[in-house]
């Protein structure tokens, strides 16, 4: 009898344990599925991006995004370490130019099969930024935006100088810049050209853009050598140097912050910077300006552009179901590009660019077409070093009136040396 009672007790305990386990499992699966996420957006960018994440979490009870914002200065160091250690989050933000630091080592997931299986709307993306995230024919990231260099124009200064049309050729730009200075006493062409505050990336971006406008390329097709020591590079650098040295439409030693403030305060006519400057400029009272794609001053429209992308770290045990959840989040974030456009960036979704919400944003519609003519940096792991080094060399060439051929020879040798180390 005692053994029988003990047996009944054991059976009861086993049943209770099973019930508790089942209840725990149900509790675990009944809650939302979590997608962890790292971003690098702070300040104004961070506020707009966080609003998209909040909206996703409000409208998706089954999936929740858990976002960890990392300061930009530390972001890629932390990301590189996490990917190498295998403890990266489920989803990451990565600049298009940085993708190649992780793709060759298999640290990012190839998305093609997952995109097809989940009917991801790839046809709704502008082709250029989408294709810039492909390597060896495979899609490794989805572009969130493009942020090309564009031209800002002070319309009041043009009116005071009697200029009716925005210049479309280099000769017109120079002539109008000179006229602005003669008629108004203001700066004609506003391009920063010193590393005093911030690297002179604007020079590299314009040098890059002018080469592509002529039909050239910055590097060879295989990205193994410089390709600008030719007539395209000569003409591009000559134009930038002449603005400072020959025509005096741009002062030498103009730093990034001063260049921004000169235009912001109405003291410059033609200002070149990325789309990210729009948010700051539109807050300036009584500044009557337009923001447009860089005209094809040297041929066809083409402009340097960066791009924030969304990628999925490759993990050994990642399930197709979890990838589906991540793609759901990516679809939502890119599909709400009108919210992100408030930070100045150009959406990559065609439906967003055609939406009323985007059209109603001031200035953005004026440069939305720049996405189609945006040119991404070459897909080489050496690009970051090339980018910074060329900015220094271009600064020296422009500010010191270095002979053009000498400057191109020096840049070519330096770039080829950098590439050889990768």
Where would I find each of the regions flagged by the language model?
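Hinge/lid segment of periplasmic solute-binding proteins
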Residues: 23, 96-150, 174-176, 182-184, ...
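C-terminal lobe and pocket-closing loops
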Residues: 116, 271, 277-286, 297-392, ...
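Short, low-complexity disordered leader/linker segments with a strong preference
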Residues: 1-36, 58, 353-361, 409, ...
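Glycine-centered hinge/linker elements that transmit conformational signals in sensory
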Residues: 176-179, 222-252
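Short, solvent-exposed loop/beta-turn-alpha elements that line the ligand-binding surface or hinge
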Residues: 112-125, 193-197, 201, 212-235, ...
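Conserved C-terminal helix/tail region of periplasmic/extracytoplasmic solute-binding proteins
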Residues: 64, 159, 242-245, 369-422
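Periplasmic solute-binding protein
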Residues: 99-107, 112, 128-166, 193-222, ...
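Extracytoplasmic "Venus flytrap"/periplasmic binding protein-like
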Residues: 55-125, 134, 159-168, 262, ...
